[in-house]
Swiss-Prot record:
It comes from Rhizobium radiobacter. It comes from the Bacteria. NCBIfam families: PRK13833.1 (NF010407), TrbB_P (TIGR02782). The lineage of its organism: Bacteria, Pseudomonadati, Pseudomonadota, Alphaproteobacteria, Hyphomicrobiales. One of its GO terms (molecular function) is ATP binding. It is found in: Cytoplasm. This is Conjugal transfer protein TrbB. The gene is trbB. InterPro entries: Conjug-transfer_TrbB (IPR014149), P-loop_NTPase (IPR027417), T2SS/T4SS_dom (IPR001482), T4SS_GSP_E_ATPase (IPR050921). PANTHER family: TWITCHING MOTILITY PROTEIN PILT, TYPE IV PILUS RETRACTATION ATPASE PILT.
Length: 323
């Protein structure tokens, strides 16, 4: 993730280019994402309301926004460098900007960084998960199990991870947490915690190697997305249990297959036994037309006879959803 500069002048320039509407949206805790399409149409996703049209932006104005972000990221935005990725100097929100020729017109998305922590109890009261699922998660935390949260884009993986981390801090306040991320999204109130972030020159695998020298009690990774997954699994297996990570996958079982794919990027050996030993609990969350819900919680009991040994906890009712 490209490092940003947060000089007040750059912040003011970016605020001016975004305009009042988008600045207000970025201050709105219910906003999930702001999207500008190449045709100039704006859309905003809000919790409980889904995606709604929010007006339009001219190509010239969109180019100014992308250029301002690029400047803050100490980069350039032009036809030879048409992709700008990074964190906004306003709030640390995730930004992805695109310019022609890879799109027909300037486009960007802003994934708003969550500002409100949703307690695990709220997931139950709003019927995003069952009481049995919440109990399984709490039991896993108390037993220092490693938890993988799976889901698609926009399913709420990071928000759920923050809720689980808050439970960890409550259950084990003396534990030292080391948190590794590409983008700063994890919220952690632990007194003894260290947050590390990747850069253009330091990748996740390198951060994980450094983490082993930082005396972690629990290792938390914002998202596993490459061969560094193998390094994390080995760390979990060698005296650092009780960790949390997220992974892009639509179901709990497909999360195991995804881990197989990622570990294959770092090793030619099959890693099912390593995965079966390191991963204890998979929490699968999804977003549907009815809202977000925890689809399933699965306990992994190892890998034997060419199969993962699993135990399913109660699934949420089919008609349940979060508002």
């Amino acid at each position: 993730m490209t490092q940003l500069r947060s000089h007040p002048r750059l912040v003011r320039k970016l605020q001016d280019s975004l305009g009042d509407q988008l600045c207000v949206a970025l201050d709105d805790a219910t906003v999930v994402e702001i999207m500008l399409n190449p045709d100039g149409r704006l859309f905003i996703e809000r919790l409980g309301h889904g995606v709604v049209a929010a007006g339009a932006m001219t190509p010239a104005a969109a180019e100014v926004v992308i250029g301002s972000v690029a400047h803050a990221l100490q980069s350039e935005a032009d036809d030879e460098r048409p992709i700008i990725s990074g964190e906004l100097p306003i709030g640390g929100h995730r930004f992805e900007g695109l310019l022609p020729p890879i799109v027909s017109g300037p486009a960007f998305t802003i994934r708003r960084r969550a500002s409100r922590l949703i307690p695990l109890d709220d997931y139950v009261t709003s019927k995003v998960m069952t009481e049995a699922q919440a109990s399984a998660i709490r039991s896993a935390i108390d037993s220092r199990m490693n938890i993988v949260i799976s889901g698609g884009t926009g399913s709420g993986k990071t928000t759920l991870a923050n809720a689980i981390i808050a439970e960890i801090v409550t259950a084990a306040p003396d534990d030292r947490l080391v948190i590794l991320e590409d983008t700063a999204e994890i919220q952690c109130a632990a007194e003894n915690a260290v947050s590390l972030h990747t850069s253009d020159t330091v990748d996740m695998a390198r951060l994980l190697k450094s983490t082993m020298r930082l005396r972690p009690d629990r290792i938390i990774v914002g998202e596993v997305r490459d061969g560094a997954a193998l390094t994390l699994l080995k760390a979990w297996n060698t005296g650092h249990p009780g960790g949390v990570t997220t992974i892009h996958s639509n179901t709990a079982l497909s999360a195991l297959r995804r881990l197989e794919q990622l570990t294959a990027e770092a090793s030619q050996q099959l890693m099912q036994e390593v995965i079966g030993e390191a991963v204890d609990l998979i929490v699968s969350i999804e977003r549907s037309g009815k809202g977000r819900r925890v689809r399933e919680v699965i306990h992994i009991e190892g890998y034997r006879n060419n199969h993962y040994q699993t135990e399913h906890y109660a699934q949420i009712e089919e008609d349940s959803h979060v508002a």
